[in-house]
Amino acid sequence: MTQEADPNALRILYVEDNADIRDMVVELIESADRRVVVCTDAETAWQQLQQATFDVLVTDVSLPGRSGTELARRWLAGDASRRVILFSGYDFKSELASLGTNVRAIPKEDFNELERALVEIRQHLDLCASRRC
């Protein structure tokens, strides 16, 4: 990231193994008020989730090794209120209900919906901070 990040920036862990998609998405979502950490597989992402605090996990479903849904399930097991966006070209809606209410499925080609989801998460976090929820 070239810009200095806001200390209150939305902390996003983005997991994607396809370099072209990864680079395009990072370019679209990274900004001064968003800090994006990128991983290419679920195991590396899990290590990041253990070492740092993130507001949202954005992950592809089909990854080398463990799937993005397995990663999400593992992270949510520690706190079901965490936010997850499954950003994938695969149809995984059947698994969505089992992951919880804070998980959204967004098709990979829908960058506008990804942006809307990140804005909504930021607004929710700001509201919670003001109400101390």
Region roles according to the model:
Residues M1-L13, R104, D110-C133:
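Non-catalytic signal-transmission and effector/linker regions of two-component phosphorelay proteins
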Residues N18-V37:
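Two-component/phosphorelay signaling modules centered on CheY-like receiver
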Residues V38-V56, R116:
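Acidic, metal-coordinating helix/loop segments flanking the phosphotransfer/catalytic sites
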Residues D41, S67-E70:
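Acidic catalytic/metal-coordinating carboxylates
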Residues D60:
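Active-site residues of response regulator receiver
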Residues P64:
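The feature encodes the CheY-like receiver
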Residues T69-S81:
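Short amphipathic alpha-helix used as the core "switch/output" element in two-component signaling
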